[in-house]
Amino acid sequence: MEEADTTQDSVVVEDTDTKQDSVVVEDTDMIVANGVINKLNTTKRLNYLKQRVKTLLKKPQPVQRSPEWFFTRNTIITASEAASCLTMSRAVCEKYAKLYNLTNFKFNDTKSTNSYEKMEDYIIKKCKAFNGENVFFDSKYTLWGKKYEEVALNLYKNIKKTEVYEFGLLKHPILSWLGASPDGITREGVMLEIKCPLTRKITGIPPLHYYIQVQIQLECAFLDEADFLECDIKEIETYEEYNEIKDIPKGIVINILEEPDNSETKYIYQNAKESEIEPYEWANGKGKELKEGSYSFIYYKIVNYSIVNIKRDKEWFNNVKNDLINVHKKIRFYQNNKSEYDKYFESIKLLKNKKHIQNINESVCLLD
C-alpha cells in the first residue's frame, strides 16, 4: 500500500490562467502533481522552485548511520539502486534511446539495466543488509569518485554561479517505498548528480543506469530538471608539472595522512568561495595551519567535463513504476520471511552454479 508523506507547507503562487491574484497550495509536494506549476510564467516558476527547495530543506531526515537511517535505506528502493530492478525492455529504455539518438540500442527483456548488478543479486543484497550484514564495499572506482566529488561540485558552482544545498535521504512524498540521495540541489531548484569516472570515457550521453538514477531523484524531489555533471580528473605527480599546466582547470587536494587507528582517508578542498586564490597559495596557507608532516599535496587537472541537463519524464516513471513496486514487494517479503529467503538464496546459487558449469563445458567444447 502506498503511504503518503503528511509533511505539509503552505506556498502562495499566482495563477496566470485566471484573474485571481494567487492560489494557495497547502502542500508544495502536490503543486507539481496538480499541474499548477505549468501555469506559471518564468519568474513565478522560479519563485515556486526556490520555495520548493526551502520545503525540501525543512523535511525531517534520519541522522546518518542511525538505526532509523539504516532501516529506512534497507527497506526502500533508492534512486541509485533502481537500475538493478529494471530490464532493458522497450518500456524502460525506448525513451532513453530516442532522447540520445541511440539507433543501435539493443532492447532485451531479461538483461538488467545495471550492467554491474542483476535483480536477483540486488534482492539478496537488500536482505543481507536488512539482517545486519555489511554488503557495501568501496572499490578503487568508488573511492576515486568520492575523492573528487567535492572538486567537481566546486567546479559546477563556479560555472553556474549558484549555491548548491546538500541533502541526505529524501523519501518520495507519496510512494513510501522510494527514496533518493542527490548530490545536491541548487537554490533555483535544479537537481545535481556528480560522477567522476576513473577510466570510463565521457561522451556527453549519461549511461543508462545513471539516467534512471536521475529520473528517480527528480520523482522523489518533485523537481523538473537535473544537471548530470561528469568530470575526467587526472592526478599530477610533481609541482613542476602542475605549474606548467595552462588553460584548463587544475587544483590541489590536501591529503591528511592517516593515523594508525584511523582507516578513513581525509581531504581538505579549496571551496568555491576561495576560488579567486591561486590553488598553490591556498594550499600553502592551509598547510601552515596543520602539523608538519601530517599532510601531503595531491595535484590534479580536470581534463574534460560535461554537464547534461536531464528533464523529468513522468511518462517514463509511470512505465516503470509497477516493475519497481514488484521488486520492492519481493524484497520486503523475503526480509520478513527468513525460511523463504533461504530457499530463494539457495535457488539463485544453484542457478549460478549450473550456469558456471555450462560455461566451463562450452569452453571445453571450443578447445576440442
Regions found by a protein language model. Name each.
Residues M1-D368:
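Accessory terminal regions of nucleic-acid processing enzymes
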